[in-house]
Amino acid sequence: MDKVALITGGRSGIGLACANRFSQNDYQVITAQRSPAENFDSIKADFSDPETPAQVIDEVIKQTGRLDVLVNNAGVMLEDSVNQMSLNDWNHTLAVNLTTPFLLIKNALPHLKAGSSIINIGSIEGLGSNPKHAAYCASKAGLHALTRAVAVDHGPQGIRCNAVAPGWIDTELNEDFIESMEDPTAFRAEIGRIHPLRRTGKPEEVAALVTWLASDDAAFVTGQIYTVDGGRLAQLPLP
């Protein structure tokens, strides 16, 4: 266990699945979020504070002396239409979902060596849009663009940067949302029907791609955005 992976938002959902997968691959895993992640070293982090990213990277280097993989997974989603959204909500969403990954990458770069990998967790909503998700969509589209820019700027140093754009994944948040519906069973079936594979995704399926992107098997892969959405974006809707 000599390689170190930092995963933001590693307490649940996709972040926890990534932490488990990297740990199984003999990485030392450190997570960063508001609350500790069970079974993993954690750094308490409020990513709405622009000072936090530098502090988190400094703490990782202090604890381990190195950083090999950065997974930018932490994020927020606030629902409101453009005409109703406050500037504070817009700024908060972009601060956590886009500025924080930028600052984490910026502070991590001096410690990343050739062969290191950055994986940003974007969203299919950076490629399309659901109603009332203007700030979220803008932040994820920006994160995809940042991914390509980092790949271009730092590829000559052997540092790779890719993004994964998940669709509907069975995280705790999404499960709670389904259970809040009047008829959860019917809603779950309807969600399945909008996917060619007729089901929603699992956090572990996203984590499998993330760990592959960090591996030597993906050594010639950089600047790419990978959708993990069961074919949802590929399927045109019918009336």
Regions found by a protein language model. Give the residues of each.
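Substrate-binding pocket helix/loop in short-chain dehydrogenase/reductase
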Residues: 81-82, 89-91, 191
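Short C-terminal tail/terminal secondary-structure segment
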Residues: 128, 211, 222-239
